[in-house]
A protein has these predicted regions:
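Hydrophobic, well-ordered beta-alpha structural blocks that scaffold small-molecule cofactor pockets
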Residues: 1-53, 58
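Structural motif
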Residues: 12, 68-69, 95
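Redox-cofactor binding/interface segments in oxidoreductases and associated redox assembly factors
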Residues: 15, 71-72, 98
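Short, acidic/turn-prone active-site loops that include or flank metal/cofactor-
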Residues: 45-47, 63, 99-103, 122-127
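Glycine-rich, highly charged phosphate/nucleotide-binding loops
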Residues: 50-83
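ADP-ribose/adenylate-binding Rossmann-like module
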Residues: 87-114
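Short, glycine-/small-residue-rich phosphate/pyrophosphate-handling segment
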Residues: 108-157
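Conserved anion/nucleotide-ligand pocket segment
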Residues: 138-203
Length: 216
């Protein structure tokens, strides 16, 4: 399958390295690709819990059980560390798109030996724009949820629910963040617990909203 065909069929894209710094290429890529139908998932450990244009930033990609595409904007050293950790965890490995500057001979050797499909030497954004590539079957926009540690002294967990596109600049300790799709499929502890609280006849979105604190 060609890159163009694959990208048109792809629905979710994890932008590894996309944080709040608007000068960074990963952040700009997120902005440049808006409107092309992809469910873009920004990943940045320091800025996790805040949002880019109403989309929550994840601290890592582990919430996704079956990701489709990682577009990586990291140094070669950090890229290789991420890939090794992912493979060792025995998770389903997505297609890896190495942005210019993220690749190295060691990374390419690792990917080839592991049999992981990948692209290198080409910018994902430029490839999509020059070839007019968009997602053929976009996913619907969904709510997102957040669990933080209370800062009022009791150290309790605080669960919040946000409609699609809601912006937030987080200033509290993060416990978990993700959208409704992550909440539905993640094997992490907090999503599993929230799913266990679903009542008969209640959707997961309704459960997440019922458990949330009222908006301030």
């Amino acid at each position: 399958m060609s890159d163009a065909s694959f990208l048109r069929q792809t629905k979710s894209v994890h932008i590894i390295g996309a944080g709040l710094n608007q000068e960074r290429p990963a952040h700009r890529a997120f902005i440049d690709m808006k409107g092309r139908g992809y469910r873009m998932v920004p990943v940045h450990p320091r800025d996790a819990g805040s949002t880019i244009q109403g989309v929550p930033i994840l601290p890592h990609p582990w919430a996704s059980v079956d990701p489709e595409l990682f577009v990586i904007f990291l140094s070669p050293e950090r890229t290789l560390g991420l890939l090794r950790k992912w493979v060792v965890s025995n998770r389903n490995t997505p297609f890896i798109w190495l942005q210019p500057g993220a690749e190295s001979d060691d990374i390419l050797e690792f990917l080839n030996e592991a049999g992981i499909p990948h692209s290198s030497g080409k910018c994902w954004v430029v490839t999509c724009i020059q070839n007019d590539i968009s997602c053929e079957d976009p996913l619907p926009k969904v709510p997102w949820v957040l669990q933080t540690t209370s800062t009022d002294g009791d150290h309790c967990s605080v669960w919040r629910y946000f409609p699609p596109g809601t912006d937030l600049n987080l200033d509290e300790p993060l416990e978990w963040v993700g959208d409704l799709m992550d909440l539905r499929s993640s094997d992490e502890r907090i999503p599993r617990y929230i799913r266990s609280l679903c009542q008969d006849g209640e959707s997961l979105a309704e459960t997440a909203q019922r458990l949330a604190i009222p908006p301030s």
